């Protein structure tokens, strides 16, 4: 097979609006209808919205690790806070040193700068081999160097506040939000309450909360000790550090509530540490999140195939795993450039492939145009759930209904069985019990048969077998040809020359002429003989009449 042509749409951010506008001009058709396909073993499992993105937006979170205690409670919390600070410094000092080495590597110009830059990266990696992702992270760290310096310039004002979250904008090139998860705890427990607590209880509460936060910090930075500055922080780690205050930054960066959960599940929101100051216990993290463009008229439809029964054995439909539909146009979608969530696809670019007319006709409901491959084995799961109902191949497995009791049989030639709550309430398949709540209405096609002409060979073993049969047929044909050649070799070539053939034809023509003349002569003689016989008979009858007349006289 040759390479298939594809439709490639590069996705720089400046083209997002143009693509969205172009697609919005196309009339939106209904989703791919799976009702006529289910009985043919092709199941539409769901749709997802298609989005394009580029990681272009950044913002900074300044995590205030050390909380400010109320003046009247500082003495009570002094001991646990000092222990917390010592542990915190021990845990995060490797991170700060790694960040500082990489940022200082750009102080030299020219080729030496490049060598120092790579050397700083390799010095931060345990095995001495820097991956492309780590070099990219280090480059981002260098770019954030000025922003980190600006944040450190404001560290006194950041550490002095008792607010759990507030914007830091003075002299910064990007949005920065100072958050303090521990400060939030202190405010909730001590600053914003009139309840009087004794010193022992304050010490215990602060100590327990600090230990819990240290555990979270260890969870975040523990796996990064080997290369602390070069590993991205996940959204979960960011929430562990910042608490619920993380939402404030995301909202400021333009992430809507309807999009937030989907983006969190995609893993596209990440963070990179850009500074750690042990004196003030400030941790700076640059957060990167995507700029997303939604293609309103484009959706991705997911297809699954079920092993069906045919007269040639079990087979599966040859259809794409994912197709995309815009208006009446359906093409195969390459999802290798996309990140999937439960409801969305986030793609850096959109790559589609045109489908053959047969597959296009098949997906539009013409099941007689669907092609099947005998590649599914007998151990393939012969059933699939769909919206509270079951599509099963009851020839491959026993479909036992527990309520009402009975065995569901599959008619001869029927590809699969559609089982819903009207035919069985509780279904048992291979020891798995399912309670059915859905139904297949009258719009679902049933009793579909797969013709022999629709089943083709695509598996490697089957193709090898077919090639073996073809080779045997060719060998037999060659044997027949050799036998024919041997017989032809015995023919006298002189007898088959041109002059001999002309002579044979001439003699044959003369023989035919003689034969025809002989036949005409024979017919003439027979006719003449019959005429003579008639004359003699007339003469005889006439003579006899005369003799009788003479006798009477």
Curated annotation (Swiss-Prot):
Tagged with keyword Glycosyltransferase: no
PTM notes: The inactive precursor F0 is glycosylated and proteolytically cleaved into F1 and F2 to be functionally active. The cleavage is mediated by cellular proteases during the transport and maturation of the polypeptide.
Glycan attachment points: 85, 191, 366, 447, 471
Cytoplasmic face residues: 522-553
Domain of life assignment: Viruses
GO BP, sorted A to Z: fusion of virus membrane with host plasma membrane; symbiont entry into host cell
Region ranges (Fusion peptide): 117-141
Localization per record: Virion membrane; Host cell membrane
Membrane-crossing segments per the record: 501-521
InterPro entries reported for this sequence: Fusion_F0_Paramyxovir (IPR000776)
Extracellular side: 32-500
Disulfide bonds: 76-199, 338-347, 362-370, 394-399, 401-424
Annotated GO CC locations: host cell plasma membrane; membrane; viral envelope; virion membrane
Sections of the chain in a coiled coil: 142-170, 466-491
Residues carrying the site annotation Cleavage: 116-117
Keywords: Cleavage on pair of basic residues, Coiled coil, Disulfide bond, Fusion of virus membrane with host cell membrane, Fusion of virus membrane with host membrane, Glycoprotein, Host cell membrane, Host membrane, Lipoprotein, Membrane, Palmitate, Signal, Transmembrane, Transmembrane helix, Viral envelope protein, Viral penetration into host cytoplasm, Virion, Virus entry into host cell
S-palmitoyl cysteine lipid sites: 523
Signal peptide: 1-31
Family: Belongs to the paramyxoviruses fusion glycoprotein family.
Free-text function comment from the UniProt entry: Class I viral fusion protein. Under the current model, the protein has at least 3 conformational states: pre-fusion native state, pre-hairpin intermediate state, and post-fusion hairpin state. During viral and plasma cell membrane fusion, the heptad repeat (HR) regions assume a trimer-of-hairpins structure, positioning the fusion peptide in close proximity to the C-terminal region of the ectodomain. The formation of this structure appears to drive apposition and subsequent fusion of viral and plasma cell membranes.
Subunit relationships: Homotrimer of disulfide-linked F1-F2.
UniProt name for this protein: Fusion glycoprotein F0
Lineage, uppermost ranks: Viruses, Riboviria, Orthornavirae, Negarnaviricota, Haploviricotina
Gene (UniProt): F
